[in-house]
């Protein structure tokens, strides 16, 4: 069965569906690596990507963003000069009621009889202004971290924005962007 468009699953309009002990055939997570780069490193800045609206992000989009950002940072910054962390986990089980189509579909399809649906994937459920991912770097690699966050935002079905924090956790976005990188 083909992958449905992300716009179908992005809205947070249904109750949470996460209890795996009650769900038969729930798929496993596609994203398995959440920390990349050098987690023990001491870095000056953290670039975090936030959501601008409540949204569900499918695990396919999270994995695509993870691969894109990690590859970009490894190529331009080097493996030991950054720490990249995915901050959300796909708990929400997505389901679909498969509808029969084609010739004589009415003979073998069930239509809306027992329409609860079968599990087809997982999604992370996020609130407004929640962090999706964080990239910790030093000042000389800050522009690569910002570009990585921008590339990750393209993979998600919502509006995103980034913030730059210093070591103490203070928001220094306007201060840094007013200076030249």
From Swiss-Prot:
Keyword Transmembrane helix: no
One GO CC term, this protein: ribosome
GO MF terms held by the record: structural constituent of ribosome
Regions that span the bilayer: none
Pfam families cross-referenced by the UniProt entry: Ribosomal_L16
Single GO biological process annotation from the record: translation
Key words of the record: Ribonucleoprotein, Ribosomal protein
InterPro entries to which the protein is assigned, alphabetical: Ribosomal_uL16, Ribosomal_uL16_arc, Ribosomal_uL16_CS_euk_arc, Ribosomal_uL16_dom, Ribosomal_uL16_euk_arch, Ribosomal_uL16_sf
Coiled-coil stretches: none
Keyword Ribosomal protein (UniProt): yes
Subunit annotation: Part of the 50S ribosomal subunit.
PANTHER family assigned to the protein according to its UniProt record, in alphabetical order: 60S RIBOSOMAL PROTEIN L10 (PTHR11726)
NCBIfam families: PRK04199.1-2 (NF003237), PRK04199.1-4 (NF003239)
Protein family according to the UniProt entry: Belongs to the universal ribosomal protein uL16 family.
Name of this chain's protein: Large ribosomal subunit protein uL16
Organism: Pyrococcus furiosus (strain ATCC 43587 / DSM 3638 / JCM 8422 / Vc1)
């Amino acid at each position: 069965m083909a992958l449905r468009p992300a716009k179908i699953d992005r809205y947070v309009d249904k109750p949470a569906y996460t209890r795996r002990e009650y769900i038969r055939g729930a798929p496993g997570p596609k994203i398995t690596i959440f920390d990349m780069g050098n987690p023990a490193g001491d870095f000056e800045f953290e670039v975090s990507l936030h959501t601008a609206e409540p949204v569900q992000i499918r695990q396919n989009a999270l994995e695509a963003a993870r691969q894109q950002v990690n590859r970009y940072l490894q190529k331009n910054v080097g493996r030991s000069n950054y720490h990249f962390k995915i901050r959300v986990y796909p708990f929400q089980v997505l389901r679909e009621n498969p509808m029969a189509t084609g010739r004589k579909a009415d003979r073998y399809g069930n239509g809306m009889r027992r329409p609860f649906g079968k599990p087809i994937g997982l999604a992370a459920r996020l609130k407004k202004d929640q962090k999706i991912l964080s990239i910790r770097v030093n000042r000389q690699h800050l522009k690569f971290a910002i570009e990585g966050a921008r590339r990750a935002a393209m993979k998600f079905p919502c509006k995103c924005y980034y913030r730059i924090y210093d070591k103490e956790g203070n928001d220094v976005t306007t201060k840094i962007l007013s200076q030249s990188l």
